[in-house]
Each structure stands twice: as structure tokens, then as C-alpha cells.
A protein has these predicted regions:
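Metal-dependent nucleotidyltransferase catalytic core
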Residues: 1-8, 49-88
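A structural signal for isolated positions on well-ordered beta-strands in alpha/beta enzyme cores
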Residues: 24-26, 47, 91, 293, ...
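Short glycine-aromatic motifs
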Residues: 23-25, 71-73, 274-275
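Active-site nucleotide-donor binding segment shared across nucleotidyl transfer reactions
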Residues: 12-46, 50-53
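N-terminal hydrophobic/helix-forming segments and targeting peptides
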Residues: 223-541
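Catalytic cores of NTP-dependent nucleotidyl/adenyl transfer enzymes across multiple folds
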Residues: 9, 84-235
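Short polybasic amphipathic segments
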Residues: 81, 149, 154, 321-328
Length: 541
């Protein structure tokens, strides 16, 4: 077994050198108990996870291993990938991420080990899965194996109270619940198993446990259900409504809403959740306290057809191809082929000020005004969200789901933001904003590392100064909830630009491209931000 781990370590070093990366993995599962001489039973396989890399790098490394002559693929989906190296089974759990604070270095470079106390905790939390209807193997056989390992480990670990103290390990359990949630989401489970664990199912195994261990496990599992009730309720509701939320993405990520045409889009997405509206913005008012206001743009960049010619509104991103034509009510009327027009006579800055068509299209009616957008298909996979331009649709859908999960949010949708932030200059918008203590702008940002886990916090940009006091409050909430984040300096403006003298900040989901016909974001980051918004709304004063 050590030879296999050594070979994997060599492959990581080779992979990192060839790609100028710092990929690291960690060992977990029964191997750790065997290595520490807790159990004599030699594991049948190695369980591995990734420490600090993007999801594309994870897959690239697995593919790199499979190039070896002695490696073969046994089973694969986007999460579980089982390999055989020299006849030994290696299992990668791609969706699982463990914070480095819960790991220790092994004797092998770039390979960490889950600390034994956390491996012990994981073995206990595994009971809920093994005793659930979704467990695909012999649950009784697996339970007896788990109990044997726990009894032996308990006799050793319980000698030091620090090894079994779970009350002080909130961050670890938050990390673990997120891992469980994303795996449940991927495999279409309809509930958080930890929330519904039935202690009666353990009763038939009571005589197999060491008595003190049995009491410990009951208290341990009760602690999880009680201390993380809010987390479990939140994640459980998402799983129960997965079809609704994915359909919301499928139906609205490509719904047309260029500047000035937002009305139909907002009314269909938010329906009776809108309580006040003007041409400059839409307000969903649900909280009696004017404490936190969440702000979104509601428009997107695109083309407007006037007298049969197409002009750009907002940042240009068109390429030649198939385009869709929508009327003023956002109803699709046609698909046409268009050719991109490059106005190269003048500089890019001057070209933007000259009223020249940006597309050459045939078949646009000359007697009306239409929205013109590139045709694109929305795809929701186990890992990613793919659509046309996710700026600003993904933020709007996130805000709408917030209202479904908890009606206690105040949300302001501004209009015409893609043409010089016109919505933030509207009297209704500015009048609403002045009433609140804290402003949180939900946004996306262009990031080549879009499939790294973590929300980006905009500290400042070329139009907005920092607010370090409010920034530190937000960071504290991220850290308290074990949600990864990255501070950054923005490259453009947001709604916050015009409100920066208040307690205002922008939280962004990284995407592969902002203004593009093909934009990708990570599902993990969508739900991380969803939870953070709830925590900000509940806990910042």
C-alpha cells in the first residue's frame, strides 16, 4: 500500500511540474486507522480527496494518472472516480473538499492525511448514510464493520478527551455538511440524511457497541441535529426543491432583458414578490427592519434592433452566428443569422460613441423595436451552470431563491445598469437605499479561476473606495461559517459605486466570462453565496 501512495506522490510532483501547479490531495477512511495501528484489517482500497485546486485540475490529474501503463479506470461519474493502479483500488471523491486545518502532512510530498479525530467523527456520521434507504450495499455488513472500527478506535482515542471533543469542532461539521449536501445534490437525494436520522435504527446494534461509546454516539448525533438545525433546514429545503430551482435557472438564465426591457423578466421571475416598482427599480419589501438591502441589476447587455439595424446596449460581445429576436414583451419571434460588424476605423473608445450597427442581419422587421441576443442553451450539470451571459441573471435567480427559502429579505432590482448605472440615479432607488444600514450587491465577476471554490468579495475598484470596517464584518461571517472567499480589486463599477458612502459591499460569484455567449459558473459557489446572504441578513446589525 505504501508503494501505491509513493507512486501517487511521484505522479503529483510530475503533474505539478509539467503544469506549473501546486495540486495536493489528502488520504481519508480506513487507511488512516490501519496506519495508526488502530485496526489490523488491511483496507481494500484508498480513499482520496483534493485539497486546494479547481475542479478542472482535479479531473486533469485523474486523467494524468490514467495515462500510466499500470492504471485503469474502473468506474466514473463526475463525483466518484474509481481507478486501479497495479491491481489496487483508488477512489477519488471529486466533490469533497476538506479545509487544511483538519489535515496533517504525511511523509509524502503533496499528500496530506485527515487528522485521526476527524476520521473518527466521519466514521460516526457515516452511520446515517449506511442506515438510510439510499445506501446501495449490505447495510448490516457495513454497520458491523463500522462498529468494530469504532470500538477499537474508541478504546484508544477516549484516553485523551481532546481526541473525542466534538463541541468545539463547529467548523469541521459545517465543512462536512456542505460536502454531504453537494454529494446529495449531485446524486439527486431529496433530503439531508443527517436531519432525518432515526435513532431507533441504531437500537438493534446497541449490544455491539462499547457501552460508553454507544452513549457518546447518541450524544454526538444529537449534537449535530440540534447545533446545526439552521444549516440542515436550509440545505434540506434546497434538496427538496431541486427541480423547482433548476427549472428556474433553465427558464430564466437566457430570458431576454436588455436595458429598458426588464419589466416582463422581473414580473415573471419574481411575480407577486415585487411590492413597489418604477422604471428605475423593483423592490421586494419583506423585513420590517430597514437593516440589510440586497441589490441586483436586472438587465443584461445585448442588441436593440431599430429600423431593421442592430445596435449594442452595454459591453459588446457579439460574434457571428445564430441570434434570437424578441419583441418588446420578450416573446421570441424569430431566429436569424447575423454577421459581426467590426468598426475598426476608429479606436474602441471612439467607436463606442458612434452610432453604427454592431451586427449585419437579414430578416429583422423594420417597423418595430426588438431585442437581439445570441442563441444559447442553458445547461445545469453536477458541477456547473452554463448559459449565455450570467451577468446579471444568476444574481437575480439567487435573490429569487432567497425569497423562497426565507421571506425575510429586502431585495432591490435596479434597471438599465448596463448603460452607465442609470438605475442607481433613479429617485425611487436612491430614496429606498438611504433607508438601510447595510447594502449588499450580489454580482458576478470575470475570473479565469472560476471553478475554484469561493465567493469573491470586492474590496475596491477604479470607481469605489474601500470600507474596511464593513469588509471585516463580512469576512467574519464567512469565517464563522467556513465558507471560502477571496478578496479582489474590481475592474469595473457596480451599483455600489453610487452608494459607497454607506455601509456597502459587493459579493461576486466567479464566472468564466461576464459578457459572452458561453458563461460558466460553479454550482458550489452559487449555494455558498445563497447561505452567506442568509447569514448576513440574520446576523449583521
Amino acid at each position: 500500500m505504501q508503494e501505491i501512495i509513493s507512486q501517487i506522490a511521484s505522479l503529483i510532483s510530475k503533474f505539478n511540474k509539467e503544469n506549473n501547479l501546486n495540486l495536493q490531495i489528502f488520504l481519508k477512511g480506513s487507511y488512516l486507522f490501519w496506519k495508526e495501528n488502530f485496526i489490523s484489517r488491511k483496507p481494500n482500497d484508498l480513499d482520496l480527496g483534493f485539497v486546494n485546486c479547481s475542479f478542472s485540475q482535479r479531473q486533469e490529474f485523474i486523467n494524468f494518472i490514467l495515462q500510466e501503463k499500470n492504471a485503469e479506470l474502473i468506474k466514473k461519474d463526475d463525483n466518484l472516480q474509481i481507478l486501479k493502479i497495479n491491481g489496487f483500488i483508488i477512489e477519488f471523491i471529486v466533490l469533497e473538499t476538506i479545509n487544511k486545518q483538519f489535515l496533517k502532512e504525511s511523509q509524502y510530498k503533496n499528500i496530506y492525511e485527515l487528522k485521526i479525530k476527524y476520521a473518527f467523527f466521519q466514521k460516526i456520521t457515516m452511520i446515517g448514510y449506511v442506515l438510510s434507504p439510499v445506501f446501495p450495499h449490505d447495510s448490516n455488513k457495513k454497520m458491523l464493520s463500522i462498529i468494530d472500527d469504532l470500538n477499537i478506535s474508541w478504546n484508544i482515542l477516549s484516553k485523551n478527551p481532546d481526541n473525542i471533543n466534538y463541541q468545539s469542532e463547529k467548523n469541521f461539521f459545517q465543512n462536512s455538511l456542505w460536502n454531504s449536501f453537494f454529494i446529495y445534490w449531485f446524486y439527486n437525494y431529496d433530503k439531508m440524511l443527517d436531519k432525518y436520522f432515526d435513532f431507533l435504527k441504531l437500537k438493534s446494534y446497541n449490544n455491539y457497541f462499547d457501552q460508553s461509546l454507544k452513549n457518546y454516539i447518541y450524544n454526538f448525533l444529537t449534537f449535530i441535529k440540534e447545533q446545526f438545525k439552521d444549516n440542515l433546514d436550509f440545505l434540506d429545503k434546497i434538496l427538496k426543491n431541486k427541480l423547482i430551482y433548476t427549472n428556474m435557472m433553465l427558464n430564466f438564465l437566457n430570458f431576454p432583458s436588455i436595458p429598458g426591457f426588464e419589466k416582463k423578466y422581473v414580473e415573471k421571475l419574481f411575480a407577486d414578490n415585487i411590492h413597489k416598482k418604477t422604471n428605475g427599480g423593483y423592490l421586494s419589501k419583506n423585513n420590517k427592519n430597514n437593516n440589510v438591502l440586497f441589490i441586483n441589476h436586472s438587465d443584461e447587455v445585448g442588441g436593440i434592433a431599430i429600423a431593421g439595424e442592430v445596435f449594442n446596449q452595454g459591453t459588446a460581445y457579439f460574434d457571428s452566428g445564430v441570434f434570437e429576436i424578441f419583441d418588446q414583451n420578450s416573446e421570441k419571434i424569430n431566429e436569424i443569422s447575423c454577421v459581426k460588424v467590426d468598426n475598426l476605423v476608429f479606436s474602441e473608445e471612439k467607436s463606442a460613441k458612434i452610432n453604427r450597427p454592431n451586427l449585419k442581419c437579414l430578416g429583422i422587421p423594420e417597423n418595430g423595436i426588438y431585442q437581439v441576443l445570441p442563441k444559447s442553451e442553458v445547461k445545469i450539470s453536477g458541477f456547473t451552470i452554463f448559459s449565455r451571459n450570467q451577468d446579471n441573471k444568476i444574481s437575480n435567480i439567487l435573490a429569487r431563491i432567497l425569497l423562497d427559502i426565507d421571506k425575510n429579505f429586502d431585495i432591490l432590482l435596479t434597471t438599465k445598469a448596463e448603460i452607465q448605472l442609470q438605475g442607481t440615479k433613479d429617485f425611487f432607488v436612491t430614496n429606498q437605499v438611504k433607508k438601510y444600514k447595510f447594502l449588499v450587491n450580489i454580482d458576478v465577476c470575470d475570473d479565469q479561476n472560476w471553478d475554484d471554490e469561493g465567493i469573491k468579495i470586492r474590496v475596491a475598484d477604479t470607481f469605489t473606495a474601500h470600507n474596511i470596517v464593513f469588509y471585516n464584518k463580512i469576512v467574519e461571517i464567512f469565517q464563522k461559517n467556513s465558507i471560502p472567499f477571496r478578496p479582489y480589486f474590481g475592474s469595473g463599477w457596480t451599483d455600489i459605486t453610487n452608494f459607497q458612502n454607506q455601509n456597502a459591499i459587493t459579493l461576486s460569484i466567479p464566472v468564466s466570462k461576464i459578457h459572452s455567449n458561453s458563461s460558466l459558473s460553479l454550482i458550489k459557489n452559487f449555494f455558498f453565496l445563497l447561505w452567506i446572504c442568509k447569514e448576513i441578513n440574520d446576523n449583521i446589525f
